[in-house]
Amino acid sequence: MNNIFGFFKSSNNTQSASGGKQNQENIKSANPLKISQNWYEERSDKLIVQRNLLIILIILLTIFMVISTLVIAFVVKSKQFDPFVIQLNSNTGRAAVVEPISSSMLTVDESLTRYFIKKYITARETYNPVDFATIARTTVRLFSTSAVYYNYLGYIRNKDFDPTLKYKEDNTTFLVIKSWSKIADDKYIVRFSVNETSGSQLVYNKIAVVSYDYVPMQLTDSELDINPVGFQVNGYRVDDDNS
């Protein structure tokens, strides 16, 4: 009897042991799936947090860029840029900054001189097919010495610079004075731009050195209407202004 009870007892123990092992195996097989699911959930949460932080950062950077642009635009509009001219002394080699002349410092003679210089540069540097060969050329002639005038004729007769070939009847130009600098009693440095009125509407920035004098002239009545005081340019040089 003892052997019989011992057999059933050992059988029950064997079944219990096998059942326990099976439960442990089921738990072990279930744990990797749960761990994997938890890892994906944590990873997804981290990605969402990172995305939200990135969106906030982009918004802050956009606001900063807008504010910076507005500040720069305000500073540029409120800041005044005045061109300056450096004059070199031919004897000593010393450099000096030439101060531009303000309107409050102008005398009557200087105002008159600036008027005639502007009139001269306008006639010489701008183009209008209506009066280029007549009034403009006559103005340059009456305001120039013979040497300066013939130098002008040689310039405009060059095919590379002749405005009648460049613009023909299709375009005109106008002058805008940017600054005046008086570097001697009879000499000015003038910064200006020549602006096209149509087509590409290009702008050509230039700088001219103009020396002048007032001399007695024998002129006709019609010529006196153009140059009534004997204003004469005895030196003229113009270059592109890249400043």
Swiss-Prot record:
The chain crosses the membrane at residues 55-75. The keyword Membrane applies. GO terms for biological process: protein secretion by the type IV secretion system. Keywords: Membrane, Transmembrane, Transmembrane helix. The keyword Oxidoreductase does not apply. Its main location: membrane. It comes from the Bacteria. It is a single-pass membrane protein. GO terms for cellular component: membrane. It is found in: Membrane. InterPro entries: NTF2-like_dom_sf (IPR032710), VirB8 (IPR007430), VirB8/PtlE (IPR026264). CDD domains: VirB8 (cd16424). This is Uncharacterized protein RP289.
